[in-house]
Amino acid sequence: MPYLLRVELPDVPGSLGRLASAIGEAGGDIEAIEIVEKRLGGTAVDDVLLETIPGTMPDSIVSACNGLDGVRVVWISRYAAGGNLFLDLEAVEALTDAPDQALDRLVEVLPITFRADWAVRLHRVTGSGAGTENAPGNLEFCDLEAPSRLEFSEDDDNLYAGARISGNEIVVIGRRGGPEFLDSELARLGHLVSLAVSIATV
Protein backbone atom coordinates (compact mmCIF):
# COMPACT_ATOMS: atom_id res chain seq x y z
CA MET A 1 0.00 0.00 0.00
CA PRO A 2 1.56 3.34 -1.02
CA TYR A 3 1.55 6.17 1.51
CA LEU A 4 2.61 9.77 1.32
CA LEU A 5 4.33 11.05 4.44
CA ARG A 6 5.03 14.75 5.01
CA VAL A 7 7.69 15.25 7.64
CA GLU A 8 9.53 18.17 9.19
CA LEU A 9 13.15 17.44 10.08
CA PRO A 10 16.45 19.20 10.84
CA ASP A 11 18.14 20.48 7.68
CA VAL A 12 21.52 18.95 8.55
CA PRO A 13 23.64 16.17 7.04
CA GLY A 14 22.49 12.73 8.11
CA SER A 15 18.87 13.63 8.85
CA LEU A 16 17.48 11.86 5.80
CA GLY A 17 19.59 8.80 6.50
CA ARG A 18 18.25 8.52 10.04
CA LEU A 19 14.71 9.05 8.78
CA ALA A 20 15.11 6.37 6.10
CA SER A 21 16.49 3.90 8.64
CA ALA A 22 13.60 4.53 11.03
CA ILE A 23 11.03 4.07 8.26
CA GLY A 24 12.71 0.87 7.10
CA GLU A 25 12.82 -0.60 10.60
CA ALA A 26 9.11 0.19 11.02
CA GLY A 27 8.17 -1.71 7.85
CA GLY A 28 8.23 0.99 5.20
CA ASP A 29 10.10 0.97 1.89
CA ILE A 30 10.93 4.46 0.59
CA GLU A 31 10.36 4.95 -3.15
CA ALA A 32 10.94 8.69 -3.49
CA ILE A 33 11.72 11.77 -1.42
CA GLU A 34 11.08 15.35 -2.47
CA ILE A 35 12.11 18.47 -0.57
CA VAL A 36 9.01 20.63 -0.30
CA GLU A 37 10.37 23.57 1.67
CA LYS A 38 13.50 24.74 3.48
CA ARG A 39 12.78 26.98 6.48
CA LEU A 40 14.83 29.72 8.10
CA GLY A 41 14.98 27.95 11.44
CA GLY A 42 17.22 25.21 10.09
CA THR A 43 14.45 22.74 9.28
CA ALA A 44 13.14 21.24 6.06
CA VAL A 45 9.79 19.80 5.03
CA ASP A 46 10.00 16.66 2.89
CA ASP A 47 7.41 14.49 1.19
CA VAL A 48 8.25 10.79 1.38
CA LEU A 49 6.51 8.30 -0.90
CA LEU A 50 6.71 4.84 0.63
CA GLU A 51 5.31 1.35 0.36
CA THR A 52 4.47 -0.66 3.47
CA ILE A 53 5.13 -4.35 3.83
CA PRO A 54 1.99 -6.44 4.48
CA GLY A 55 0.75 -6.06 8.03
CA THR A 56 2.50 -2.75 8.67
CA MET A 57 0.31 -0.05 10.17
CA PRO A 58 1.03 3.58 9.24
CA ASP A 59 0.91 4.47 12.95
CA SER A 60 4.08 2.46 13.52
CA ILE A 61 5.90 4.46 10.85
CA VAL A 62 4.66 7.74 12.33
CA SER A 63 5.82 6.68 15.80
CA ALA A 64 9.24 5.66 14.48
CA CYS A 65 9.70 9.02 12.76
CA ASN A 66 8.46 11.07 15.70
CA GLY A 67 10.89 9.19 17.91
CA LEU A 68 13.82 10.81 16.12
CA ASP A 69 15.28 13.98 17.60
CA GLY A 70 13.89 17.07 15.87
CA VAL A 71 11.58 15.12 13.55
CA ARG A 72 7.83 15.71 13.38
CA VAL A 73 5.35 13.95 11.11
CA VAL A 74 3.01 16.58 9.71
CA TRP A 75 0.68 14.22 7.88
CA ILE A 76 0.38 10.72 6.43
CA SER A 77 -2.20 9.39 4.00
CA ARG A 78 -2.73 6.71 1.42
CA TYR A 79 -1.41 7.85 -1.93
CA ALA A 80 -3.56 6.87 -4.88
CA ALA A 81 -1.65 8.56 -7.71
CA GLY A 82 -0.18 5.38 -9.10
CA GLY A 83 2.82 5.37 -6.81
CA ASN A 84 4.71 8.00 -8.80
CA LEU A 85 5.75 11.48 -7.79
CA PHE A 86 4.89 13.85 -10.61
CA LEU A 87 7.46 16.61 -10.55
CA ASP A 88 7.04 20.15 -11.81
CA LEU A 89 9.20 19.49 -14.87
CA GLU A 90 6.86 16.71 -15.95
CA ALA A 91 3.92 19.05 -15.45
CA VAL A 92 5.62 21.63 -17.67
CA GLU A 93 6.18 18.97 -20.32
CA ALA A 94 2.49 18.04 -20.22
CA LEU A 95 1.51 21.68 -20.69
CA THR A 96 3.86 22.30 -23.62
CA ASP A 97 2.91 19.09 -25.44
CA ALA A 98 -0.45 20.59 -26.45
CA PRO A 99 -0.42 24.41 -26.17
CA ASP A 100 -4.03 24.77 -27.29
CA GLN A 101 -5.09 22.53 -24.38
CA ALA A 102 -2.67 23.95 -21.80
CA LEU A 103 -5.35 25.18 -19.38
CA ASP A 104 -7.22 21.86 -19.46
CA ARG A 105 -3.93 19.99 -19.03
CA LEU A 106 -3.15 22.26 -16.09
CA VAL A 107 -6.25 21.07 -14.26
CA GLU A 108 -5.32 17.45 -15.00
CA VAL A 109 -1.75 17.64 -13.69
CA LEU A 110 -2.23 19.85 -10.62
CA PRO A 111 -3.60 17.13 -8.29
CA ILE A 112 -0.63 14.86 -8.98
CA THR A 113 1.91 17.66 -8.88
CA PHE A 114 0.68 18.97 -5.53
CA ARG A 115 -0.56 15.74 -3.93
CA ALA A 116 -4.06 17.15 -3.98
CA ASP A 117 -7.32 15.25 -4.38
CA TRP A 118 -8.80 17.35 -7.15
CA ALA A 119 -8.58 20.55 -9.21
CA VAL A 120 -11.18 22.73 -10.91
CA ARG A 121 -11.40 25.92 -12.97
CA LEU A 122 -13.93 28.50 -11.76
CA HIS A 123 -15.35 31.27 -13.93
CA ARG A 124 -16.82 34.49 -12.58
CA VAL A 125 -20.04 34.13 -14.60
CA THR A 126 -20.47 30.44 -15.42
CA GLY A 127 -19.07 28.93 -12.21
CA SER A 128 -17.36 25.54 -12.28
CA GLY A 129 -15.63 24.63 -15.50
CA ALA A 130 -13.18 21.85 -16.30
CA GLY A 131 -12.42 19.77 -13.25
CA THR A 132 -10.98 16.43 -12.23
CA GLU A 133 -12.96 13.60 -10.71
CA ASN A 134 -14.27 14.38 -7.22
CA ALA A 135 -13.96 18.15 -7.72
CA PRO A 136 -16.86 19.89 -5.96
CA GLY A 137 -19.34 21.55 -8.26
CA ASN A 138 -20.59 24.23 -5.88
CA LEU A 139 -17.52 26.42 -5.30
CA GLU A 140 -17.91 30.12 -5.95
CA PHE A 141 -15.49 32.30 -7.89
CA CYS A 142 -13.39 34.71 -5.86
CA ASP A 143 -11.02 37.47 -6.94
CA LEU A 144 -7.36 36.57 -6.48
CA GLU A 145 -4.37 38.80 -7.05
CA ALA A 146 -1.82 36.20 -5.93
CA PRO A 147 -1.83 32.45 -5.21
CA SER A 148 -3.58 32.01 -1.87
CA ARG A 149 -5.04 29.57 0.61
CA LEU A 150 -8.81 29.70 0.32
CA GLU A 151 -11.71 29.01 2.65
CA PHE A 152 -15.24 28.05 1.66
CA SER A 153 -17.68 28.32 4.55
CA GLU A 154 -19.78 25.31 3.60
CA ASP A 155 -16.89 22.85 3.84
CA ASP A 156 -14.57 22.13 6.76
CA ASP A 157 -13.11 18.89 5.40
CA ASN A 158 -11.02 20.28 2.55
CA LEU A 159 -8.02 22.57 2.43
CA TYR A 160 -7.94 24.80 -0.64
CA ALA A 161 -5.45 26.82 -2.64
CA GLY A 162 -6.16 28.93 -5.69
CA ALA A 163 -4.45 31.00 -8.35
CA ARG A 164 -5.61 33.50 -10.95
CA ILE A 165 -5.85 32.47 -14.59
CA SER A 166 -7.40 35.76 -15.71
CA GLY A 167 -9.63 38.49 -14.34
CA ASN A 168 -12.61 36.19 -14.79
CA GLU A 169 -11.16 32.76 -14.09
CA ILE A 170 -9.21 31.01 -11.33
CA VAL A 171 -8.04 27.47 -10.65
CA VAL A 172 -8.58 25.82 -7.26
CA ILE A 173 -6.99 22.66 -5.86
CA GLY A 174 -8.11 20.81 -2.75
CA ARG A 175 -6.86 18.31 -0.21
CA ARG A 176 -9.17 16.32 2.02
CA GLY A 177 -7.97 16.59 5.58
CA GLY A 178 -4.53 18.02 4.86
CA PRO A 179 -1.77 18.80 4.86
CA GLU A 180 -1.98 22.58 4.71
CA PHE A 181 -0.64 24.22 1.56
CA LEU A 182 2.78 25.71 2.30
CA ASP A 183 4.01 29.09 1.04
CA SER A 184 6.48 27.32 -1.25
CA GLU A 185 3.62 25.30 -2.77
CA LEU A 186 1.60 28.47 -3.37
CA ALA A 187 4.59 29.95 -5.19
CA ARG A 188 4.94 26.82 -7.35
CA LEU A 189 1.21 26.89 -8.09
CA GLY A 190 1.47 30.50 -9.23
CA HIS A 191 4.41 29.73 -11.51
CA LEU A 192 2.68 26.75 -13.14
CA VAL A 193 -0.57 28.63 -13.69
CA SER A 194 1.29 31.60 -15.19
CA LEU A 195 3.19 29.24 -17.46
CA ALA A 196 0.00 27.52 -18.60
CA VAL A 197 -1.59 30.89 -19.39
CA SER A 198 1.44 32.02 -21.39
CA ILE A 199 1.56 28.73 -23.31
CA ALA A 200 -2.17 28.88 -24.08
CA THR A 201 -1.94 32.42 -25.45
CA VAL A 202 1.14 31.98 -27.65
For the regions a protein language model found, what residue spans apply to each?
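A conserved regulatory-domain signal marking ACT and ACT-like small-molecule sensing domains
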Residues: M1-D97, V109
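Hydrophobic, well-ordered secondary-structure segments
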Residues: L89, L103-V107, L186
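Amphipathic alpha-helical "output/dimerization" segments
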Residues: F181-V197
